[in-house]
Amino acid sequence: MAQPSNMFDTFETVGLREDLADVIYNIAPEDTPILSAIPRAKATSTKHEWQTDTLADAAANAVIEGDDATTDALAATARVHNFTQIMDKVILLSGTQSAVDAAGRADEMAYQIAKKSKELKKDMEFALIKENLSVVGTATAARELGSISTWIATNGSAGASGGALSAGFNAATGLTRATASGTDRNITEDILKSVIKDVYEAGGDLDMFVVPPSVKQTVSTFNANTTRFGPAGEKVEYAAIDVYSSDFGDIQVVPNRIMALTNEKMCFLLQRDMLAAAYLRDFSINELAKTGDSERVQLLVEWTLEMRNEKAHGILLDINQ
């Protein structure tokens, strides 16, 4: 049906205001399950050091009445270290861009700072998860922290051709070592239970199982030992609260989206208080020198992973995602 004669409609109108919602919708994931769950610590040098120790195994102990005391052997602590890594995000906005009226935000620089801050934390989570050996650094090469997988030497399970765990701190070089790649396999409850037992026997008290999303779906099929609630009143910074009830205690099963990006085929069994994020320079926002009609801001953090005792943790290698 045609319009009546001389109809004036929106197709001819000049000066209609643009209809642009004054809200920006962003659903990109920003959660950082490991970084948000572990404690913070203070680093005072680019080479962040700490000590680890252990107890002797239990043994028979009976002393003859009236006998002279026999001195026990003493063992020295182990001194280990990781290097701080500088991470940043830099924003450059023209003076005009800062002045114009932009939809969805009152201040373009403030909006970009908030956005880049979240991205910086995601990069930190990536650094914990992606296999990365520690690097001393030089005037031409950045210092790098040794990631979680490069520290765990005692408790773990690798694919058929992977053999014994090869990672861990190398006292001779002062650097962390890489894991050995094995045959890819699907996660099973037997694999999980085996590593949990190894950690328990080594003295660990696991409370967190971090997995890629697809592996989380498989773990959820371990119906006999999985519940969908957490400790009453506990406040956590990650969404999932599924709990795997092992023979040695309850362990929260936490899906990690960033794990899917690394393609490392790893899952971590962690005792949260036995690792920390150690900050040499905490998060800061620095206005850089003005060189023209623009504003330049740097978001910066310098930090490292403090693996307080690798025997408290476990790793599942060569797990299909």
Role assignments for model-derived ranges:
Residues 1-321:
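Flexible, glycine/threonine- and acidic-rich loop/arm segments that mediate assembly and lattice contacts
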